[in-house]
Amino acid sequence: MSLGAADVGAGAGPPGQHAGAVDNWPVAIIGSGVVGTDLMSRIGNGDGRLRVSAMVGTNPHCDGLARAAAAGISTSPGGVDGLLSMPEFANIRLVFDTTNPGAHQSNWARLADTGVRMLDLTASAIGPCCVPAVNLDAQLDAPNLSMATCSAQAAVPIVAAVRRHGVVRYAEVVSAIASQALGPAERVTLDEFAELTTTAVQELGGARRAKTLTIVNPADPPMPMRTTVFCLVDQADEVARNEADVLAVVDGVQALLPGYRLKHRVQFERLGSGNTLYIPGTGEFGGTRITVLLEITAAGGYLPACAGNVAIVTSAAKATAEAIVERHAQTLKAKI
């Protein structure tokens, strides 16, 4: 994957330097590949509530560890064992795992008894699933929190918004992701990620039934990630409010990732007699089909623009960690 040359750590400073910072949590990143490096960049460009104190990987020659070292961050090629042996670990409050589902199980087994919080970007689903735009507050106390897949981060807020004004009988999510933005590990787990996305659309988005499709887009030059969300809704009396709620959640996600946007206006199609749809396992459907077309560009980090699939997860993880810091500060304040 061809990566940009954004400066890691730009805008970061010593604890307390950032005006209005609630706290300054030392965090560690496991995984020095594309995901970990983008996350490090986003934290470095953040408001100071988080500070990357350590990054570990397994390749001593990778770009991520080199960038971390250049930014003054302690590094180790020893993986989770290397992290545990670093003097900085004594002060680490939260660990991001950007490796893969199998490695995450081993990493969590090593860290679970240390008292650190874990944000899982591997979609291993050991902990509860989190889409910050939908269920952030309900999950902040979990010791291990699993960030939903890129397609779920994009689509679940839309489905949840539509669900406010009617029963979503069926939702379908179709994501096209640039071939250049998918590494070997992601390619072999596309089916697993689709299942996790479908589960999130139903459990967090509120759809009765759902389906997820992921298309690898071979276009060159590469295109940004595009996600289309179809919702079949029973009633159609709330078109204006549905559109307003969709626009509001797009604005909310856009605050986390500026590259998240509507590609076209929200589309509404009434389905009735002579114009019904057949849903396998459900039967004929008459009501309203709502279509939302999204484009997700990797803005503001280490990645090329086409890698919105990575950026939306790292941005969600950063926002979740910042909310954990905020919750911790509020809890301490309440005890004073």
From Swiss-Prot:
The active site is at 150 (acyl-thioester intermediate). The keyword rRNA-binding does not apply. It is an enzyme of class 1 (oxidoreductase). Keywords: Aromatic hydrocarbons catabolism, NAD, Oxidoreductase. The keyword Aminoacyl-tRNA synthetase does not apply. It catalyses: acetaldehyde + NAD(+) + CoA = acetyl-CoA + NADH + H(+). InterPro entries: Acetaldehyde_dehydrogenase, Acetylaldehyde_DH_C, NAD(P)-bd_dom_sf, Semialdehyde_DH_NAD-bd. Disulfide bonds: none annotated. HAMAP family: Ac_ald_DH_ac. Belongs to the acetaldehyde dehydrogenase family. This is Acetaldehyde dehydrogenase 1.
